[in-house]
Amino acid sequence: MLCGRPRSSSDNRNFLRERAGLSSAAVQTRIGNSAASRRSPAARPPVPAPPALPRGRPGTEGSTSLSAPAVLVVAVAVVVVVVSAVAWAMANYIHVPPGSPEVPKLNVTVQDQEEHRCREGALSLLQHLRPHWDPQEVTLQLFTDGITNKLIGCYVGNTMEDVVLVRIYGNKTELLVDRDEEVKSFRVLQAHGCAPQLYCTFNNGLCYEFIQGEALDPKHVCNPAIFRLIARQLAKIHAIHAHNGWIPKSNLWLKMGKYFSLIPTGFADEDINKRFLSDIPSSQILQEEMTWMKEILSNLGSPVVLCHNDLLCKNIIYNEKQGDVQFIDYEYSGYNYLAYDIGNHFNEFAGVSDVDYSLYPDRELQSQWLRAYLEAYKEFKGFGTEVTEKEVEILFIQVNQFALASHFFWGLWALIQAKYSTIEFDFLGYAIVRFNQYFKMKPEVTALKVPE
């Protein structure tokens, strides 16, 4: 039985006053020993029912016949509803380019609870993907950074020149991630040279190519030589045309609403529940903040593009020899506001395990980053490369205000993970940190005004 209780209105007011009084000092919290790659587009919005049918003409109560005008009105209403639903679906549909290779689906389930069962499942996949490999010589390496899924590297020999990555989906992550959309995004990005090869999917995961290089951490993303590569690669993804002629629409608010509907109301463990009730905003406050964000941020004028949506440091692979970067993990990719993707990346300068928001990029670094991004984005879109100070200023304001939505989104995500995930990580603590930072930075960034 859950120990949760609803907060009173006075509790809510006290909570907001407390948040408004947070210190501007760096927030630095030890979360856990795990780090990095985490985090389904929301369900389609419900199709509204057509208008109630008139119950007959005056003086003919109980009759079910309709006049010709009434029939016409009903027919038009139904057509409008259907057309609206189709338009919404197409505006969120990720179009895989013709000629893209199909991805095989293997009827294999990889058990990850016991090491020998995990190896059996991985070897079953390798029989299809690397039939020339001797099973006795295959080495399995567990990557421990992930806090959504389990990731295993499979290779033979002493060097990791040819590595097959086996990703096993985390418990209940189907609540958070639309796996079909993930595969579409993977294929689109692969077709444009922005993703490794996707070898196959299987019953509870997928296999893909290992990218040679170094997974970055917060100290790397502040390096101008590296962050300019990151800005250019993100601009390349944002410039991809994957909407087949329809004007794309962001699914941010729908996905956020879905996450909100899934957050727990309490925890069975008494100590965890006390922490949850004292440090997490009430559902009423969260609902009010979501309404406010949608009204304000949707009107900032940020373009909707194909976004990565989870560009934390460990999802960026830097190859010093080749002088380039590649992004990995496309679970949360999809159409979103351009400024959200950048703001989310800036939030990730603080890290995941040891969160330190004093590492959030200052205005000077952001200005350099955003200028490099705009130059590359215009180049990829065929608009030239000249960037004005006003363009940089507008994007700066949009990015920092959308950073609020990023904090809120991952706060909701972490609450759901705290309920379901079997990975060793303090998800509740992470949710607390993200919501605290949301309320801390809200007054400062909302005071920024887009120039006329």
Swiss-Prot record:
**Keywords in UniProt for this one?**
ATP-binding, Cytoplasm, Kinase, Lipid biosynthesis, Lipid metabolism, Nucleotide-binding, Phospholipid biosynthesis, Phospholipid metabolism, Transferase
**Lipid metabolism as a keyword?**
yes
Query: Which BP terms does GO give this entry?
Result: phosphatidylethanolamine biosynthetic process
**Coiled-coil residue windows:** none
Q: Which EC number(s) does UniProt give?
A: 2.7.1.82
Tell me the tissue specificity: Expressed in kidney, liver, placenta, heart, leukocyte, ovary and testis.
**Pathway given in the UniProt record:** Phospholipid metabolism; phosphatidylethanolamine biosynthesis; phosphatidylethanolamine from ethanolamine: step 1/3
Is Transport a UniProt keyword of this protein? no
Gene3D superfamilies according to UniProt: 3.90.1200.10, Phosphorylase Kinase, domain 1 (3.30.200.20)
Q: Which reaction does it catalyse?
A: ethanolamine + ATP = phosphoethanolamine + ADP + H(+)
Known role: Highly specific for ethanolamine phosphorylation. May be a rate-controlling step in phosphatidylethanolamine biosynthesis.
Q: Which family does it belong to?
A: Belongs to the choline/ethanolamine kinase family.
| Protein name (database record) | Ethanolamine kinase 1
